[in-house]
């Protein structure tokens, strides 16, 4: 008797893309309700703003990374990743990690273990094929799992560190994933979509930009108020912008499935420059963090999940009206957030509060 796999659990990205999309809406609605004094989360040990940041990172972004990782590693190695019942169990494990901590702090262990489990699964497959170059993905997922644990331990008062540090570090790690994977796929997708395009792609330069990016993040974590940090961050932003220009973003104007990736990546150089300005005290750090969080991460996620969902199910990779609307809305949201925060006052309360 042939066992049929439920389509939802046939490929790694399907349940996790869906869960991430659902949770992003639910968590944002809860955050808006908390801002207006009518949240349903109740009074707990974790302040609302930190819960919001945590769920955007570990409830939304890393969930997409997990789904992408399971699907990408299957494609890279030719080996099967969890599907059917095992994938269903992973999905339920994720759900327990989201809902359990709302009832008891003991359930946070489920949330903490999710990313290391995904890292172990994909790491084993990558090692089986000796694809050492791709080990960065399970390694980063493992570090994200550790940072998630540090966040909970600091938020509940078990260790004496600022609980914002693991949150910001986690966001920076996610941006590093975007830089590494984006640097591979965005120029490639662009070249495939536009026949005869001439790009500037230099591996040595890309490696230098990657090194500057990692250095900027480390400096900002340990020395956020420093002239050196500010200058390195701004320089990194300029280098990232040069890298992006080499991929010929303006040539993608008629290809929404590609231009969304360029538009989203643009927020990365902008984020570094804003991070440098925050070290000088010229802008709030939250502007830089949301440039990375909404503009870059949100934009790259909506761009990549629509693309990978089409590609891995054998459909034509072309953005329709619904997809384009989603692309535009995410980018407009990022711009509105920036305007709201810069103008504070009326605009901030009207758009966010």
Where on the chain are the PLM-derived regions?
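Hydrophobic alpha-helical transmembrane segments of multi-pass integral membrane proteins
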Residues: 1-353
């Amino acid at each position: 008797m042939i066992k049929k796999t439920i389509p939802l659990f046939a490929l790694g990205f399907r349940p996790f893309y869906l869960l991430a999309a659902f949770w992003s809406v639910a968590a944002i609605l809860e955050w808006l309700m908390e801002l207006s004094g009518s949240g349903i989360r109740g009074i707990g040990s974790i302040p609302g703003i930190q819960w919001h940041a945590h769920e955007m990172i570990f409830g939304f972004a890393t969930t997409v990374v997990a789904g992408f990782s399971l699907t990408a590693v299957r494609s890279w190695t030719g080996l099967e990743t969890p599907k059917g019942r095992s994938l269903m169990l992973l999905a339920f494990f994720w759900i327990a990690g989201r809902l359990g901590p709302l009832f008891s702090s003991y359930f946070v262990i489920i949330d903490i273990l999710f990313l290391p489990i995904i890292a172990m699964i994909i790491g084993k497959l990558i090692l089986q094929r000796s694809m050492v170059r791709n080990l960065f993905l399970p390694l980063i997922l493992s570090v994200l799992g550790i940072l998630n644990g540090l966040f909970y331990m600091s938020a509940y008062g078990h260790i004496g560190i600022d609980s914002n540090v693991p949150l910001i570090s986690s966001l920076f790690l996610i941006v590093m994933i975007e830089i590494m994977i984006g640097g591979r796929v965005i120029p490639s997708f662009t070249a495939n979509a536009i026949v005869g395009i001439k790009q500037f792609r230099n591996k040595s330069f890309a490696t230098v930009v990657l090194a500057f990016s990692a250095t900027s993040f480390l400096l900002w974590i340990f020395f956020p108020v420093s002239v050196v940090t500010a200058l390195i961050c701004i320089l990194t932003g300029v280098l990232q912008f040069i890298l992006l220009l080499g991929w010929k973003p303006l040539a993608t104007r008629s290809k929404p499935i590609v231009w969304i990736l360029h538009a989203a990546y643009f927020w990365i150089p902008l984020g570094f420059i804003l991070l440098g300005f925050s070290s000088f005290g010229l802008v709030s750090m939250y502007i830089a963090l949301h440039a990375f969080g909404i503009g870059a991460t949100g934009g790259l996620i909506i761009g990549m999940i629509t693309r990978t969902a089409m590609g891995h199910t054998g459909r034509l990779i072309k953005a329709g009206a619904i997809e384009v609307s989603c692309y535009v809305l995410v980018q407009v949201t990022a711009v509105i957030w920036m305007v709201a925060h810069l103008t504070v006052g009326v605009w901030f309360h009207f758009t966010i509060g």
